[in-house]
């Protein structure tokens, strides 16, 4: 039932057979929950919510549910609240959950342009390529001293952005009872949004719907109680193994909107605020943009096709059923999968990697320290390991073993 014509190329088949079923199942689950909870207003968060909104508009038949596209990002919601609590501990709860954190990622988190602080960075014995391991980042005197010297600039910029965000949220009528929809994983943007609305005195009751809620959601529950709900896995309600973790980069790439991430907001007239975006990451690599678009177009084609099948209403597919094709590629990629998808670049808070990695085992034998750095940065670890080791090994089991060792 989930098979594409043999005449279609790899990316079309992948979009139709792997991404399409997941997107379709998630959309039906979302609509079911909105109706059961009688939620009449929903905001799809950029950028991952873009393709989900497209799927929603193909499937939803309830005209009483109004849907909107809210142009936000982790950065655009996080930076405006830094002035409320700019302690280093508060910042750590907002940083990327990656075990390896670059200085660029740190500056992205605080909303400042790293290039403007080159001299200050050098004074603190750091450079643009510096990175830190999460487990001992609190003990890095150079970084904590740098952060202390940046406090005034952080707060000043944060308050400016807070005022503009407040106006944008008012413009978009973000108030009352509503749902937000995004890819996942820990409710960070929901926390930042809820904290902003509470600070400006806007009544709100937010229900978050995600493709998954990861175990580290707990870090966002300290100062805000969040209503989180996950489709594939939901650690806020019950334990179910997070099987997308080893290929989170590939997974997130499938949901990307064809525009840059939201940076902040700017006033273009007395009554209008607009989102200011970063340049689109794939603008200089049109081939990768076309690959992602082709995959997404075929996923939507799958939804159109399956929605036209009357018999489909008699089937009861679980989230595991509809995730299985994508999971197979993510956890146990073939050499063809790695060749076709592994060279796609992945951008995450200032860091750029290729999904399948760049080097073979021979390189890491000569540069062993680089292996740890690259493995921690990589976002499709099963493909990375297979490309490096080549042998037919159980790479998902190896990944889980490495995770336990890391702890």
Regions found by a protein language model. Give the residues of each.
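Long, low-complexity, Lys/Arg-enriched
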Residues: 1-407
């Amino acid at each position: 039932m989930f098979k594409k014509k043999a005449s279609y190329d790899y990316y079309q088949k992948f979009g139709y057979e792997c991404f399409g079923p997941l997107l379709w199942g998630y959309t039906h689950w979302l609509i079911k929950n909105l109706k059961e909870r009688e939620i009449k207003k929903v905001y799809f968060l950029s950028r991952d919510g873009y393709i989900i909104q497209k799927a929603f508009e193909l499937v939803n038949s309830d005209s009483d549910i109004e849907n909107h596209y809210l142009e936000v990002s982790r950065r655009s919601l996080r930076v405006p609240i830094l002035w409320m609590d700019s302690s280093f501990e508060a910042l750590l709860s907002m940083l990327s959950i990656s075990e390896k954190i670059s200085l660029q990622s740190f500056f992205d988190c605080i909303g400042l342009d790293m290039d403007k602080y080159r001299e200050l960075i050098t004074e603190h014995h750091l450079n643009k390529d510096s990175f830190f391991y999460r487990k001992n980042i609190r003990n890095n005197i150079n970084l904590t001293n740098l952060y202390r010297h940046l406090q005034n600039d952080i707060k000043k910029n944060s308050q400016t952005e807070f005022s503009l965000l407040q106006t944008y949220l008012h413009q978009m009528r973000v108030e009352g009872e509503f749902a937000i929809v995004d890819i996942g994983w820990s409710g960070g943007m929901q926390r930042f949004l809820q904290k902003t609305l509470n600070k400006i005195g806007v009544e709100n009751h937010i229900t978050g719907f995600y493709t998954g809620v990861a175990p580290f959601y707990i870090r966002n529950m300290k100062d805000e109680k969040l209503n989180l709900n996950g489709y594939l896995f939901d650690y806020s309600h019950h334990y179910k193994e997070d099987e997308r973790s080893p290929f989170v980069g590939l997974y997130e790439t499938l949901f990307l909107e064809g525009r840059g991430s939201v940076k902040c907001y700017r006033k273009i007239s007395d009554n209008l605020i607009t989102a200011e975006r970063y340049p689109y990451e794939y603008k200089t690599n049109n081939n990768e943009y076309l690959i992602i678009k082709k995959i997404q177009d075929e996923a939507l084609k799958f939804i159109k096709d399956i929605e036209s099948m009357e018999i489909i209403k008699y089937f009861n597919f679980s989230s595991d059923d509809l995730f299985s094709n994508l999971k197979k590629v993510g956890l146990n990629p073939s050499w063809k999968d790695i060749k076709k998808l592994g060279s796609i670049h992945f951008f995450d808070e200032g860091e750029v990697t290729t999904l399948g990695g760049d080097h073979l085992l021979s390189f890491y034998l000569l540069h062993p320290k680089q292996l740890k750095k690259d493995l921690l940065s990589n976002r499709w670890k099963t493909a990375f390991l297979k490309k490096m080791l080549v042998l037919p090994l159980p790479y998902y089991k190896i990944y889980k073993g490495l995770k336990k060792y890391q702890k």
